Structure formats: C-alpha cells, structure tokens
Amino acid sequence: MKPILTSLMALLLCLNANAQSNFYKMTIGAGAGATQSFADLAKHDYGFAGYGAFDYLFTPFVSLGLEGQMGEINGGDVNTDPNNRQFINSYKAFAINGKISLGALINYQRNSFANAIKGLYVGAGAGVVMNKMRFVVREKPDGSGYIFPGKDSSNDLLIPLNVGIAFNFMDRYGYSKYGINFNYQTNITLGEGLDGYDDSPLKFKSGNPDIYTYFSIGLKYHFGSVGLSTKTLY
C-alpha cells in the first residue's frame, strides 16, 4: 500500500510541476508607429511617433507599467479645411497603463488556437500629454484678420485605452526572454490643447473630446526577479 501511495504522490507532484512555469517580472520595450488625430478639424491626418515602456508583471498576463511617447500629431489642411485650419503638434506623452491578457481568463493549454492568442490583451490608464505646436494656422488666411484662439503649448490630462497582442519567445532555459508587441491605443484628452485651437463652441460646434490614436509595433526584453505561474507558458 505504501509504494502505491508514494507513486501517487510523485505523480501528483509531477503533474503540478508540469502545470507551472517561471517568468521574469519586469520588461522594457521600445517601438514606433503611426498616430492619427480626431480633433475639431475635418481632416484626420497621420503622424509618426516612437515610444519606450517599462512594465511590472504580477503574473505573465497581468501588468502595470509606465509608457513615454514622442512624435507628431497632425490634422487639418490650410487649403481644404472649411475654416483654413491646420496644425502639427510635436508632442510628448507619459502614462501609467494596466493590462490584462486573455491568458489570465481562459484555459489555453489544450487548445492550439487559444494558446496562440493567449497574448491578446486590453488595458487602460492615465497620464498627461504635453502639446507643442510646430506649425499652426493662427490667423485665418482670408484677409479678415480673425485670430483663432488657442495655445501653442499646453498640457492635457490623458486617458489611454489599449488593445493588442504580444508574442513571447522562450530562451534555452524555458523563460520568456524576448517578445514582439502590436498595440492600438486610443488616447482621450481632457482639454483643448491637442490641436492648438480653443474656439467658441458656438462658432465651431464639436462637443467631443480631442482624441488621437497610436498604432505601434515594438520589441520587449524580459528581465529581473523570477515569479511562478500556475499556468504553463508553452
């Protein structure tokens, strides 16, 4: 009887060990991509921006991190805009982001498709965007002398909403060491500084917050102390 119990205990320990994986608790990453403005101007133009990020992983699928962006947000066209407005915003943004991946919510270990998409995630955060107009049409070019109200430099609170997917690659020791990340971020600003215009809503009807989106591709490096996941990461 004793050998049977010993064998059963050994089997349970083996199964439990197989269902666990080690993971690094910190990542740094960098990447680049395209911004698009959705402000008060008719033309939602594209710009280019880069980013850097640091994340702390509570589990392989739940994280909290810091992100910094720098680049351009563009919009309008002095020739085609109904009010001849245009701006180029050389911006910087900093935010705290929390993310949760699909792998935290599903059992992906017996389904190859679920395993492939376990890195799908959503997230949200809070931060600040620092606006600096590299170019803005401040005086309406129709001879009227009308000056568009607004600031060339300003800071606005920011609410980033993220959706994306991360693919991690194991090193020879079975740890997720490197990764590639595809992210689509919608940034809702709480202010009127993103496009440099703060006109009367009676003259320029909007009612919507200034928004910019950011699609990026980046690389990640995992490092730091090691945690234990109750799910296998393979």
Outline where the language-model segments fall.
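Short glycine/proline- and aromatic-enriched beta-strand/turn motifs that initiate or cap beta-hairpins
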Residues: 19-57, 220
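Short loop/turn motifs that connect adjacent beta-strands in outer-membrane beta-barrel proteins
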Residues: 20-25, 61, 105-118, 169-178, ...
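Gram-negative (and chloroplast) outer-membrane scaffold detector with strong preference
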Residues: 62-141
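Predominantly the C-terminal beta-signal and adjacent terminal strand-loop region
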Residues: 78, 91, 168-234
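Structural signature of outer-membrane beta-barrel domains
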Residues: 35-37, 71-75, 103, 127-133, ...
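Residues that define the transmembrane beta-barrel architecture of outer-membrane proteins
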Residues: 24, 44-50, 90-94, 118, ...
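Residues on the lipid-exposed face of transmembrane beta-strands in outer-membrane beta-barrel proteins
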Residues: 30-34, 52-56, 96-100, 124-128, ...
